[in-house]
UniProtKB/Swiss-Prot annotation:
InterPro entries: Arg_succ_lyase_C (IPR029419), Argininosuccinate_lyase (IPR009049), Fumarase/histidase_N (IPR024083), Fumarate_lyase_CS (IPR020557), Fumarate_lyase_fam (IPR000362), Fumarate_lyase_N (IPR022761), L-Aspartase-like (IPR008948). This is Argininosuccinate lyase. Keywords: Amino-acid biosynthesis, Arginine biosynthesis, Cytoplasm, Lyase. It catalyses: 2-(N(omega)-L-arginino)succinate = fumarate + L-arginine. The gene is argH. It is found in: Cytoplasm. CDD domains: Argininosuccinate_lyase. Its main location: cytoplasm. Belongs to the lyase 1 family. Argininosuccinate lyase subfamily. The lineage of its organism: Bacteria, Bacillati, Chloroflexota, Dehalococcoidia, Dehalococcoidales. One of its GO terms (cellular component) is cytosol. Pathway: Amino-acid biosynthesis; L-arginine biosynthesis; L-arginine from L-ornithine and carbamoyl phosphate: step 3/3. PANTHER family: ARGININOSUCCINATE LYASE.
Amino acid sequence: MSHIRSRFSKPADELVVRYTTSLPFDWRLYKEDIKCSTAHARMLSKQGIISAEDSQSIINGLNTILTEIETGSFVFKPETEDIHMAIEGRLFELIGEAAGRLHTARSRNDQVATDVHLFVKNACDETINKIRTLQGALLEQAEAHPQTALPGYTHMQIAQPVLLPHHLLAYFEMLERDCGRFTDARKRADVMPLGSGALAGVPYPLDREMVAKELGFSAISQNSLDAVSERDFILEYLSDAAICQMHLSRLSEEMVIWSSAEYAFVELDDAYTTGSSIMPQKKNPDVAELCRGKTGRVYGSLNTMLTVMKGLPLSYNRDLQEDKEPLFDCVDTLGDSLEVFAGMIKTAKFKPERMLRALEKGYVLATDIADYLVGKGESFRNSHGIVARLVSYAVAQNKTFGELSLAEYRQFSNLFEKDIYAVDIKSALNARNLPGGTAPKQIAQAIARAKKILAEAGVKN
């Protein structure tokens, strides 16, 4: 019987053991747990709470366990409650009674909270790195297509011409905000709970600052009740992940649409597409579709954790064991999505000729013709009505703007002159030469800015 059941007269029911164990998933915290225990043992010795000999024996044993886990020789016993007890149990086997001194001035409540704080800090760093890689892929494609124009859409209807790099860099901006959110989330995770004990602190002269420094935390928690029971930092990561995955889902949707035969704006590399079991001709954008689908999974992780936390009184409650599976799954799902998307974007082949052909439809220059009339002295509202009627006429005649004669133009306004034919895709793009616009000069500046952002982040592009 486990020593933590010394209070009880009989062992836990077999079903209870299976129901309450977290080892099948929290084993992933082994690095964080060993790191925390090593720092704790070193501090206990420095403070004279345990002997230097016991401390070194504990640290040596923990190093052995780390090697065993990483080489696959560690035996995870199914009856063990969690990763903390698995490591402690093996430590007893390796060094004997000295192992029992490790848990002095510590509870699993502050122990696991510290482990997860470390995990989330690392997850934030890894997520940001993966976002940067995807940003680099988007920037690379933007630089490769400086003059490629395509229709911009509102309501999935052709609206105005934009440059392809302008479109791609829109996602760069979304991802840049994601980086900012994960950077902020890391700040909340960068606080060490260890030393809070079960809930009220501990009656030992701990040097919490020493442990925090060794573990790389910038601060220690200020309220033991809060420290062992708060999971805000997990919720913040999950919330940020949900937003980031949503951005990927939007990009996924466009890759699905753009790679269809009807659009054919992009061809996805064979390595990032799949076939059909019955239709030989199919080249399916499954990576993009799965990324879009997995967005619900990430949202589910956030909703799970919000629900776990919503009714918990202070301080620690076993409900908090349910924090790890949604966290781990979310970290994995978002990480995989970012990685696979970076490869898919990097290898995608955009089709400028198809985009140009699409610009010939939908009267994409309607707004620019209205602006032309404004330049001639007409009010914008009147110009809007004039061009709306002009579009209706062109549709009825099955003509493009360029195919209309000047006489036809002048049926709608005498302000139209020969220079109306100078209103074209190039002039429409050049006209939007203000910060944030799609003019080539602005795109060049946007690309330079994006390159600077990645360079400052240490990303080579």
